[in-house]
Amino acid sequence: MATVSGTEEEENAKKRKAHGMLKLYYGMTEEGKACERHLEPTDVDGVHFNPELYLTKLRKESSLSQLMDVEADMVRQIRSLDSEMQTLVYENYNKFISATDTIRKMKNDFKKMEDEMDGLATNMAVITEFSARISSTLQERHQQITKLSGVHTLLRKLQFLFELPARLKKCIELGAYAQAVSYHSKARSVLHQYQHMPSFHGIQTDCQAIMAGLADTLRQRFRDPASSPQDLSECVEMLLNLEEPAHLLCDEFLAHGRGRLASHLSDLQESGDILEFVDRGCGGFISDACLLAASYQSLFSKEAGSTAQMAEAKLTSFLEELSTGYFELVEKRLRQEKSLGDNSLLVRALDRFHRRLQAPSKLVPGCGFNRRGTEIVVRAAQERLAQYLQALKDFFQGCLTDVRQALAAPRLPGKEMPALGDLLAGLSASVLNQIKTVLAAVHLFTAKDVAFSDKPYFKGEFCSQGVREGLIVAFIKSVCQTARQFCEIPGEKGTSTPPALLLLLSRLCLDYETSTISYILTLTDEQFLGQDHSPVTPVSSLCSLARSTAQTLLNQYVKSQGLVVSQMLRKSVETRDWVTTIEPRNVRAVMKRVVEDITGVDVQVGLLYEEGVRKAHSSDSSKRTFSVYSSSRLQGRYAQSYTPSAPMDTNLLSNIQKLFSERIDIFSTVQFNKVSILTGIIKISLKTFLECVRLRTFGRYGLQQIQVDCHYLQLYLWRFVSDENLVHCLLDEVVGSAAHRCLDPAPMEQSVIEVICERG
């Protein structure tokens, strides 16, 4: 019994070990709920399952319906497991049967192989026995057989030598020149060695005469212009085997090739598409040059000693001479390529040209095909950049011409003049889009699929000095220079530049300074990541140039608009007789025109510039004039001006007043806002008005007319300037100067002035 129980324990231990390996396979070795579940005696799937405890627990904890459900579930599981077991048994049985058949077949095959190996061993033994018998039989005659074989070989060679002249003639008659040369080459050393023997000397003489005739025939074929390159190579190879001078053959071979290459160059003189031109040149000249070089090297470079060096030097000199003409034609054709419509055509042509030069560069490194081709590509790229720069300049000039025409075009009934904001936006967008288009076209030179893009120039200098500095920076400087020219020279047909164009260009340059320049250069640097560390123009320098240009244009705009208003005021003062004029009843039309023009300028400037900052206005800004040049003050101030008793006192009073008044800088720097621009124009206009008044003499009514006009200007101009006191002071000086120059200074009542201005 103890033995039986021990056996059962061993079996249980084996089962537990197998079960443990299964748990290890399914990853259930960790401590936790899985282990606790298998130790539970009521777990059907556990190792320690106890049926009695399981049934007792079910009866205690479950109702009848639950027991029936458990029964149904267990029946279903049993059926499922039974079905799976049957399937496994069937599959394993099939595999077992298949394995049995395979083993049986292998046994049969090995048995056949054993029989064949036995037969092979028997045959090898028989062969070995026969070989030993033959060797023992022929051992005594081996030396005799070897001697006879040598004699036989010698007789065959002698027979070949005696038959050689006849064979050579036969080959020449059949045109088998290569075979004849081969025969003679094999026998030449033997004939030369035994030429002292009469029989061999005669054979040698006959052979030399025959081969001399063959050499003449080969030279004629070699010099025939209609001979193909293959025929030339064969002729040269045979002549070299006939020991013709190598240097003469080199010269003749190259001279024959010169004609073919020169004909290709003459064909390239015809004009055509650049890509077609490159294809024709590469397919004709370059291909034939490569073929000629390869044939030449295969014929002459294999010669030993100095012959190979001499041949290589001749080939290098020959190709350098002819390639110079070819490269000149290519550069001449590239200079004719002025069309900028499709830059990809030029880049493709240059890429193909550069690629096709790699073959001759490898064949003949001394010619420098690759170096010279790269130089041509670089010069073509530089020329293209210069063309694009000029195209950008022309495009900008064309845009400015369109803007000028739009500004100068007569207004049609029912159609408004184009707004400056729209013209500025259109001009800026057009120029920017054109720059992007040019950058995209130029970027083709650095594309990854272009062969020459990996050259140092296109990785460095082309990007930084060519595109950035030579194209973009140069164009930005050109824009500023072109804009400045409108301030320095008269326009077309001697007319001055339209003030609106000056204003528009000043805003364009200001926009360039604030954002456009940085955007363009950033875009350029991102597209052309060069490896060159050469110094470049900083963005701040270009922005300063653009701002300076904008300031110059704006100052010129203020001067030109101030000049327009000043001309009206000057003519209105100079063409009127102020002494005998009638009593004023209304505001002069020129003053209304001045207010209208300045209002129009205000609207025009407001389309492009911000409002700006004004000083705080007083509540009675439009009426402050009355307190300054009122009738009572004028009477007290200037009543004694023209009496001989007190001229010095009046002048002293006027000068003292000027000392305490704030100095007005007429041509001060204009700020980039509407208020500053209008202030500058009004200062120039009123200063001109003041100087013209100082040069005239006035009567009573002339002074009163000036009073009315100045009051009208004060009513409307104060709102345009940054400081209303500026208008106040200038108009006060105008009225004061008129009163000072008046023969009968009797000012008009303030209430009357007010009524006239309101009515006007």
Swiss-Prot record:
Keyword Membrane annotated: no
Cellular compartment(s): Golgi apparatus, trans-Golgi network; Recycling endosome
Species of the source: Xenopus tropicalis (Western clawed frog)
Family the UniProt entry places it in: Belongs to the VPS51 family.
Major localization listed first in the record, in broad terms: Golgi
Quaternary organization: Component of the Golgi-associated retrograde protein (GARP) complex Component of the endosome-associated retrograde protein (EARP) complex.
One Gene Ontology CC term in the entry: GARP complex
Coiled-coil spans in chain: 97-127, 374-395
Protein name as catalogued: Vacuolar protein sorting-associated protein 51 homolog
Biological processes per GO annotation: endocytic recycling; lipid transport; protein transport
Keyword annotations from UniProtKB, A to Z: Coiled coil, Endosome, Golgi apparatus, Lipid transport, Protein transport, Transport
Pfam families referenced in this protein's UniProt entry, alphabetically: Sec5
